[in-house]
UniProtKB/Swiss-Prot annotation:
This is Polyprotein p69. Its EC number is 3.4.22.-. PROSITE patterns: HAV_P29_PRO. Residues 25-73 are annotated as: Involved in colony morphology alteration.
Length: 622
């Protein structure tokens, strides 16, 4: 993987600018490892021997590393991406995903983020702002665009990042990624000028057990406008006293932050009183429940997520996918829709049904899939009326006169009428001869069928086969691909239908709520909690035809042509995962078996047969 060769110092730090800064590569081993493929800066440093501290800003700017060494100091974005994480869940985070797909990307940041990081480094080291950031309410204009919209709270950074408390929260992530966990005083002073906070509380700078390493303790109780300026003065004093100082405690690898279980934990959120829960009980950390095949599995840490994923990959066959699709669709779409528009829909459905009932049977029957034409001896009568548009000549080549006339219902040109005269006998063939004749006719028939099928296929007709066995094979093969996502279609088409039906009445009144139940909502929706993000991710994976798990992608696109099948599907909705205390505003709820049920009083019990339940709309007495 990596070859050893003699060190070339030019690779490492081109020039130490001033002698006071310790060159972190003083004691580089005699061989130095040149990585093949992408490695992280830390692995690169370790391969260079025992390097004292972490690299700081100045180093990063001067550092010349071989290609493929990633310079980020923090290689992934924590799940703080979501403003309110539900307690202790693990989102599908690029690093985690990469790890369990088995293609670990060492650095899961996007290229764009890395570019902005390097621009930030250049800016901070290039010059000084007109007014230092610690004097004004928000960071100076040039940096403002580089601050993320997302705030990093200190709880999300482990030890060694205490210096971030004096830095604007919107810049913390970028600073952590470019600066690492122990910042040099010289670099820190520049950072304070560009992205320092004006008021953060009273502070104290403590010397730690290790030489030249200091720790900042901040007490946020008493904040004033002068905090930033005072802190800057203090750090300036420290820089004069000890030019080699670094700020940020020493990292202890045994600390809780480094246990893989809690590495990507999200800080707990302050609970809010909601109408649903009614009280604020903080139950501690609830694990995320993830379905692995038929089993639910509790996930509290990255480790668990990896294990669950492994399991899921092992037994995640077609049926699971199908069930999962059905569940997710129903959960996301149909349920929402029903909860809001149920009375309307049921009225509508009743009206539609009564209209259907008046129509002739042919239009009431559900459309069936096109039959595969199997041109066999016994089912000659199934042949299509015009033999797939062959010319008369072509037809007479393929079919015996008998077959053609049979299909056409014409009198055949030459036929012996059995005579009425009892003396003229039609002697029956002997059994053996009959068998021979039939066999011969069948053989000829097979040859013709093969020729016909071949020609039809060449003309691009897809559903013609030459023999029964081929028909069976084709059917099996098609079913394997075609019906993999059948549950998904059912749900999708139910949604399409409901949407088409209630469009006119509902759209105006329902406004945003209506739009929420459309499919595009799934794509535009910004997750509000990590769990939500998880659900969305998996729903999107199921929906995105490009990502369908090796199943026919065309099948997903059937959508609109499909909505005719959804007539009964409407009344059946998968059971929601969480059963909440009954909400007086929602009509009815969903029984165990997924049929909708309207109200539970004894008066309605006798009405609850299938037909009535689907057509009757009960008044709700408050």
């Amino acid at each position: 993987m990596a070859q050893l060769r003699k060190p070339s110092q030019s690779l490492v730090l081109s020039e130490s600018v001033d002698p006071t800064t310790v060159d972190p590569f003083v004691s580089v081993r005699t061989e130095e490892v040149v990585p093949a493929g992408c490695i992280t800066l830390w692995e690169y440093r370790d391969s260079c021997g025992d390097v004292p501290g972490p690299l700081s800003h100045g180093d990063l700017r001067r550092l010349r590393t071989p290609d493929g060494v990633c310079k980020c100091q923090v290689h992934f974005e924590l799940p703080t991406v979501l403003k309110s994480g539900s307690t202790g869940t693990v989102p599908e985070h690029p690093a985690v995903l990469a790890a369990f797909i088995g293609r670990p990307r060492r650095c899961s940041l996007e290229q764009r983020t890395k570019e902005l990081d390097s621009r930030f480094l250049q800016l901070v080291h290039g010059g000084l702002p007109a007014r230092p950031s610690y004097m004004i309410a928000r960071p100076p204009r040039p940096v403002r665009g580089l601050c993320s919209s997302r705030n990093g709270s200190l709880a999300q950074f482990g030890q060694g990042y205490c210096y971030l408390s004096a830095i604007v929260d919107s810049a913390r992530w970028r600073v952590a990624r470019t600066t690492g966990w122990c910042v040099r005083v010289a670099d820190y002073l520049r950072l304070l000028q560009w992205v320092g906070r004006r008021s953060f509380g009273s502070f104290q700078i403590e010397k730690s057990a290790v030489d030249h390493v200091y720790h900042v303790v901040v007490d946020a109780e008493y904040q004033s406008e002068q905090d930033g300026a005072l802190f800057y003065q203090a750090i300036l004093g420290l820089a004069e006293k000890d030019p080699l100082a670094r700020i940020g405690g020493r990292l202890n690898p045994l600390a809780a932050e480094f246990a893989p279980g809690s590495a990507l934990r999200v800080e707990p959120v302050t609970p809010q009183v909601t109408r649903r829960k009614g009280s604020t009980r903080m139950t501690g950390r609830d694990p995320t429940i993830v379905s692995v095949g038929k089993v639910g599995m509790a996930i509290t840490s990255i480790q668990d997520a990896l294990v669950a994923t492994e399991l899921r990959n092992v037994n995640f066959g077609r049926r699971d996918t199908e069930a999962e699709c059905r569940r997710l669709w129903a959960r996301y779409e149909v349920n929402d829709y029903f909860r809001r528009h149920k009375a309307e829909l049921l009225k509508f459905d009743a009206r539609l049904r009564s209209r259907m009932a008046k129509k002739p049977a042919s239009s009431r029957a559900r459309p069936s899939d096109a039959k595969i034409q199997c041109i066999g001896w016994r089912d000659r009568h199934l042949l299509p009326q015009r033999l797939a548009g062959l010319s008369k000549q072509g037809r007479s080549l393929v079919w015996s006169r008998f077959a053609t006339s049979n299909i056409r219902r014409k009198t055949p040109p030459c036929v012996v009428n059995p005579s009425a005269d009892p003396v003229v006998h039609n002697w029956k063939d002997s059994a053996a001869l009959a068998v021979k004749k039939i066999a011969e006719a069948r053989r000829r028939q097979e040859i013709r069928a093969a020729a016909y099928a071949e020609r039809a296929k060449a003309r691009g007709q897809t559903n013609v086969v030459a023999s029964i066995s081929e028909a069976i094979e084709t059917t099996l093969r098609r079913n394997k691909t075609r019906f993999a996502l059948d549950g998904l279609h059912l749900a999708a088409s139910a949604i399409v239908t409901t949407r088409l039906r209630s469009w006119n009445q509902e759209e105006i009144r329902a406004g945003r709520e209506f739009r929420k139940s459309t499919t595009s909502w799934i794509w535009r929706h910004v997750p509000s909690s990590i769990q939500d993000a998880l659900n969305l991710t998996s729903v999107r994976d199921k929906l995105d035809p490009g990502r369908a798990f090796g199943y026919v992608q065309a099948a997903v696109a059937q959508g609109m042509s499909d909505f005719r099948r959804a007539k009964r599907a409407l009344a059946i909705v998968a059971k929601p995962v969480i059963r909440n205390i009954r909400d007086p505003y929602e009509h009815g709820f969903v029984k165990r078996d997924g049929k909708l049920r309207h109200s539970r009083d004894a008066f309605n019990k006798k009405l609850r047969t299938k037909a009535v339940a689907a057509t009757k709309v009960h008044k709700i007495k408050f």
